[in-house]
Amino acid sequence: MSSITLALSKGRIFEETLPLLAAAGIVPADNPETSRKLIIDTNRPDVRLVIVRATDTPTYVQYGAADLGIAGKDVLLEHGGAGLYQPLDLDIAKCRLCVATRKGFDYAAASRPGGRVRVATKYINSAKTHFAAKGVHVDLIKLYGSMELAPLVGLADAIVDLVSSGSTLRANNLEEVEEIMPISSRLIVNQASLKLKRELIQPLLEAFAGAVK
């Protein structure tokens, strides 16, 4: 029997995906927040979930280890989207990709055309594209966490990171100075899977689309 595999990450994306799965008649057999299982069965024998790191979701789908996945726009921009069909913005896990600096830093002057800014981020591609469009020379420093520390210790002038409420920035005496883009999570589909398993995937796409409206 043909089956489909959906790649999800733990945390906010998984929790906000549950109502969409329910709309498609899919109920996970385990909760990844409390279970150590990385492959989770569902109430449907033809659907299973695999639990992966958020940044790995597009790779699993690109290479066909998963037929579908749910990933943030931020992750997809860094991945590049090769081999992926992105049929639907699910409007979940919403936040924004922003530039932030320590309070008092003259970002307006530093980011004028021809200026130079040292930026710490894990979103290298998005940051590079943003500053290139502004005509600003940018020295990018790749970090994987604790972005807020970089301006405080002189590692960088600014950071590019995801912001939701802004409370972490405020707690570290930083401020949001520019929004790069709004971020939400999208449904992604392996292009070959869509052709070979359309009879299974298409109803799922339609159920998700109906739930998002």
From Swiss-Prot:
Q: Which InterPro entries match?
A: ATP_PRibTrfase_cat, ATP_PRibTrfase_CS, ATP_PRibTrfase_HisG, ATP_PRibTrfase_HisG_short
What family does the database annotate?
Belongs to the ATP phosphoribosyltransferase family. Short subfamily.
HAMAP family in the record, alphabetically?
HisG_Short (MF_01018)
Q: Which GO terms describe its biological process?
A: L-histidine biosynthetic process
**Protein name per its UniProtKB record:** ATP phosphoribosyltransferase
Q: Which GO terms describe its molecular function?
A: ATP binding; ATP phosphoribosyltransferase activity
On subunit structure and binding partners, the annotation says:
Heteromultimer composed of HisG and HisZ subunits.
Q: Where in the cell is it found?
A: Cytoplasm
Pfam families from the xrefs?
Answer: HisG (PF01634)
GO cellular-component term (any): cytoplasm
Please name the Gene3D superfamilies in this protein's record: Periplasmic binding protein-like II
| Function comment | Catalyzes the condensation of ATP and 5-phosphoribose 1-diphosphate to form N'-(5'-phosphoribosyl)-ATP (PR-ATP). Has a crucial role in the pathway because the rate of histidine biosynthesis seems to be controlled primarily by regulation of HisG enzymatic activity.
Instruction: State the domain notes.
Output: Lacks the C-terminal regulatory region which is replaced by HisZ.
Keywords, comma-separated and alphabetical: Amino-acid biosynthesis, ATP-binding, Cytoplasm, Glycosyltransferase, Histidine biosynthesis, Nucleotide-binding, Transferase
- Annotated pathway, please? Amino-acid biosynthesis; L-histidine biosynthesis; L-histidine from 5-phospho-alpha-D-ribose 1-diphosphate: step 1/9
Q: What is its EC number?
A: 2.4.2.17
Q: Native species of this protein?
A: Aromatoleum aromaticum (strain DSM 19018 / LMG 30748 / EbN1)
**Which superkingdom is the protein from?**
Bacteria
Instruction: State the reactions this protein catalyses.
Output: 1-(5-phospho-beta-D-ribosyl)-ATP + diphosphate = 5-phospho-alpha-D-ribose 1-diphosphate + ATP
Name the enzyme's class. Answer: transferase
